[in-house]
């Protein structure tokens, strides 16, 4: 790959090169670089479940009035636009259109924080595609209000279990 095949993105830890065609961002790239364990990508059912949780959180939180109209970087987002764009983007992920954008190793350490950021970055990028920038939406979804990053992996796995017809005991 040449330098033109990358874009520079910055977070609180510094700047990294991210593939120019990637829908994910710097935090996902950092996880890929830091956790090169198996070389595998997350399983399709897990990606589907993460997107299902993100979609549900966006729609329910809109209904509960937890999303507000926001002005970010000169762009106006109504609460309804925000919720609908996140839900639509999550549906595209659920349909399997963007499986190649989920690149965090399934065996990475932790409670799923890197998988959560991978999902947030991809969904935010898709949700804001018409505007050309994903940063404003990413800052607005911030965990999709009420859906915590440490709960995403267990919630997602529970959704997979239900979807696959597995009995879940608590």
Q: Which functions belong to the PLM regions below?
A:
Residues 1-149:
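Conserved, well-structured ligand/cofactor-binding cores
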């Amino acid at each position: 790959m040449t330098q033109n095949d990358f874009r520079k993105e910055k977070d609180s830890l510094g700047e990294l090169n991210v593939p120019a065609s990637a829908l994910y961002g710097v935090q996902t790239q950092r996880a890929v670089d830091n956790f090169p364990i198996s070389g595998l990508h997350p399983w399709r059912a897990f990606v589907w479940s993460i997107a299902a949780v993100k979609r549900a959180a966006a729609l329910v939180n809109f209904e509960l009035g937890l999303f507000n109209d926001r002005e970010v970087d000169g762009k106006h987002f109504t609460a309804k636009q925000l919720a609908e764009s996140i839900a639509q983007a999550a549906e595209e992920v659920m349909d399997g259109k963007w499986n190649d954008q989920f690149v965090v190793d399934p065996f990475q350490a932790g409670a799923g924080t890197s998988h959560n950021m991978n999902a947030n970055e991809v969904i935010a990028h898709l949700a804001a595609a018409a505007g050309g920038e994903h940063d404003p939406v990413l800052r607005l979804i911030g965990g999709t209000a009420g859906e915590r990053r440490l709960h995403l992996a267990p919630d997602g796995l529970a959704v997979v279990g239900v979807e696959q017809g597995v009995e879940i005991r608590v």
